[in-house]
């Protein structure tokens, strides 16, 4: 199976940038579980592990950074939940808080319940972002209308966790989570251009597959119709730009 990308320049945003410091990925909206922008201990001290006990066996160390820890970047479930529309709503995040993210793939999943057993329900078709360079860069991405996965039904007052994954070009996955409580739209704080906008220097590309080449022959490579899967996500981005 061959992986390809198709540029979508019309999706590039034209909004303001904001200044950031060096770190990893941060969820802007809904409110994320907490600050997991920490790197503690050393690779040698952890014997090459991504997570290990400190030498005194009293604390965990994260020599590569907390955000490399599945499912929520080393952060436990939060009691400070954000009300989120019961029919779906906005998800906004900042992807460039670390070196090596000039290109990255974005996944957004949801886990159901106060303490979800897993995050196995994809909310969007994955897409690729293209940043200005491999140095840390400012900027925000917002999907103004992320809907619940097909077949998932929730009620007002139910709890869930939204998981944002940034798959970096060196293969590492960075995890971040936001704990939510479903509410009626009129009971949810307004989402506006202060917390939901798309920065002009971050562009978007689709991710799709082509059929494999059999027996090294030069057979025609067919591209399946992926647009029906990815267009809703990107139309949501474009809609957010128009409404900002």
UniProtKB/Swiss-Prot annotation:
Binding site for Cu(2+): 24
Disulfide cysteine pairs (residue numbers): 72-177, 142-196
GO MF term set: metal ion binding
InterPro entries in UniProt: BIM1-like, BIM1-like_dom
One Gene Ontology cellular component annotation held by this UniProt entry: side of membrane
Cytoplasm found in the keyword field: no
Cofactor binding note: Binds 1 copper ion per subunit.
Lipidation (GPI-anchor amidated asparagine): 215
Cofactor: Cu(2+)
Residues that carry a glycan: 57, 80, 118, 159, 192, 198
Modified how: The catalytically essential N-terminal histidine His-24 is post-translationally modified by methylation to prevent protonation of the histidine side chain, and protect the critical active site of the enzyme from oxidative damage.
Membrane topology: Lipid-anchor; GPI-anchor
Domain of life of the native organism: Eukaryota
CDD domains recorded: LPMO_auxiliary-like
Full protein name: Lytic polysaccharide monooxygenase-like protein ANIA_04702
The species this protein was found in: Emericella nidulans (strain FGSC A4 / ATCC 38163 / CBS 112.46 / NRRL 194 / M139)
């Amino acid at each position: 199976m061959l992986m390809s990308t198709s540029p979508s320049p019309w999706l590039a945003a034209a909004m303001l940038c904001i200044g950031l410091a060096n770190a990893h990925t941060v969820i802007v909206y809904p409110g994320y579980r907490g600050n997991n922008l920490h790197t503690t201990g050393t690779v040698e001290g952890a014997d090459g592990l991504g997570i290990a006990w400190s030498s005194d066996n009293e604390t965990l160390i994260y020599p590569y950074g907390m955000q490399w820890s599945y499912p929520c970047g080393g952060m436990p479930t939060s009691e400070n939940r954000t009300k989120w529309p019961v029919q779906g709503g906005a998800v906004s995040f900042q992807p460039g808080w670390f070196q090596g993210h000039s290109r990255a793939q974005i996944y957004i999943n949801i886990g159901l319940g106060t303490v979800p057993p897993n995050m196995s329900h994809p909310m969007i078709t994955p897409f690729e972002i293209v940043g200005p360079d491999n140095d840390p860069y400012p900027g925000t991405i917002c999907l103004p209308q992320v809907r619940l996965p097909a077949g998932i039904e929730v009620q007002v007052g139910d709890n869930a966790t939204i998981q944002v994954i940034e798959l970096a070009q060196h293969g590492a996955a960075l995890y971040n989570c936001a704990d939510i409580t479903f509410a009626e739209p009129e009971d949810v704080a307004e989402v506006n251009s202060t917390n939901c906008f798309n920065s002009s220097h971050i562009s978007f590309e689709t991710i799709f597959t082509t059929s494999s080449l059999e027996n090294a022959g030069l057979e025609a490579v067919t591209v399946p119709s992926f647009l029906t899967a990815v267009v809703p996500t990107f139309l949501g981005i474009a809609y957010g730009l128009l409404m900002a």
